[in-house]
């Protein structure tokens, strides 16, 4: 029925696929991979990317950055007043309490999503204008430091150090304050357009509750999706909150 006409990207999150088309993002249920089913969709203005973390989808489109509540994936909801205007948002990655947007000539735009329904622009980083054609960014940790790997189009690959013990107090914390600085560059044969996703280590289950690692203790297992949802949803499917 043409629901995927104009498909331009796909983001996998467990047994679900989020596919961007010309005017919306479509959620596919891939629990039976040979019989995919359309679960839901939400409107978007030429979406370019989606990053998934817990109950939220962080989307970039021609309007900029937008937060979508996917607590119920059958009824995704754009969070009102949870958007940030960006001129050329091309891709997005999320790592704990920060989203990293590949923003073309504006370089890397870092957005604070500690409160996902109230995102705030944290910083724009261009290395004094040298990062100016950003197509993609992926964030990963090596040992105890956080790095950003940037596909900067005509400028090739750029590596950012985001945290380190010398510049970032509390860098061992859950989500320390990030302070980007360029530590390496590599000119590529052609424009650098994309960065592959790194390995997710120490991960027990995927976004749909499927076990992805083997535990080293006899009889142990991670919680499944139903068990996890009971920790943050009431019997009526509402999110637990405190006043």
Describe each model-derived feature in a short phrase.
Residues 1-243:
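Feature marking well-ordered beta-strand scaffolds used for ligand recognition
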């Amino acid at each position: 029925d043409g629901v995927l006409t104009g498909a331009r990207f796909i983001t996998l999150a467990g047994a679900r696929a989020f596919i961007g088309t010309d005017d919306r993002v479509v959620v596919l249920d891939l629990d039976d991979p040979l019989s995919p089913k359309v679960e839901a969709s939400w409107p978007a203005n030429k979406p370019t990317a989606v990053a998934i973390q817990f109950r939220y989808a962080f989307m970039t489109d021609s309007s900029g950055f937008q937060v979508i509540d996917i607590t119920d994936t059958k009824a995704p909801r754009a969070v009102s007043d949870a958007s940030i205007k960006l001129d050329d948002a091309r891709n997005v990655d999320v790592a704990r309490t920060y989203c990293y947007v590949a923003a073309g000539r504006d370089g890397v735009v870092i957005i604070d999503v500690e409160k996902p329904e109230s995102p705030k622009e944290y910083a724009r980083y261009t290395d004094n204008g040298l990062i100016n054609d950003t197509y993609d960014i992926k964030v990963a940790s090596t040992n105890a430091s956080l790095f950003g790997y940037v596909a900067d189009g005509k400028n090739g690959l750029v590596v950012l150090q985001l945290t380190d013990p010398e510049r970032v107090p509390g860098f061992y914390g859950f989500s320390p304050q990030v302070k980007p600085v360029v530590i390496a560059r590599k000119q590529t044969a052609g424009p650098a357009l994309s960065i592959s996703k790194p390995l997710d280590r120490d991960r027990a289950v995927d976004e749909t509750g499927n076990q992805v690692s083997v535990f080293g203790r006899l009889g142990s297992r991670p919680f499944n999706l139903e068990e996890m949802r009971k920790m943050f949803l009431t019997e009526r499917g509402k999110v637990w909150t405190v006043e």
